[in-house]
Amino acid sequence: MIRTVNLKKLYTTEEVETTALDNVNLDIKEKEFVAIMGPSGCGNSTLLNLLGMLDNPSDGEYYFLNEEVSKYTERQRANIRKRNIGFVFQSFNLIDELTVFENVELPLLYLGISASERKKMVEDVLERMQIMHRRDHFPQQLSGGQQQRVAVSRAVVAKPALILADEPTGNLDSANGEEVMNILTQLNDGGTTIIMVTHSPHDSEFAHRIIHLFDGHVVTENYKEKFHV
């Protein structure tokens, strides 16, 4: 599903050039659950932004579903992104002025799906995430765990092939964090590829493979036997 070749990201100011990622080579298969770990500032979130086509690499190649996308225009990348990738963030990133239903519906509006089909798809995912009873509430009326359930619902409502999760349990207590990890595991069991940045050794144990970054480099990869292509 994903392959990177010597992926590099530089940030340049007038005086300083900083290397955020340097010669990162990855091969991530469909239906895999991969955790990316490393100290703060080592390039974890930068890598996730590149994989999600929210930013461009400074050098190297990025293949997504057998297409070399790093040279695509922003419009081309946006079209691929909205059809294939869902995002889950530590801070939820819900829109305060929209209800739970409207937040989850948003990706479907961008895809031009009819109102009747949107209603069915949103209700299906809210039922699956056990948050249907909150459909008309606003984010500020929800607990942290409920907000993250809504965020996950929004990420998966369009049935993307890939979920990118950046510290999905970082703002949650242990019980709600465990629920979110179980939801991600269920999605992965259903065939969704998941790449998750985490600082939590516990959360990383849900993955098939753990990739360790340090100073912008992949330093180790630990595989688990439970994933089979």
Placement of each model-derived feature along the sequence:
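Conserved beta-strand-loop-alpha-helix hinge in the C-terminal portion
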Residues: 209, 217-229
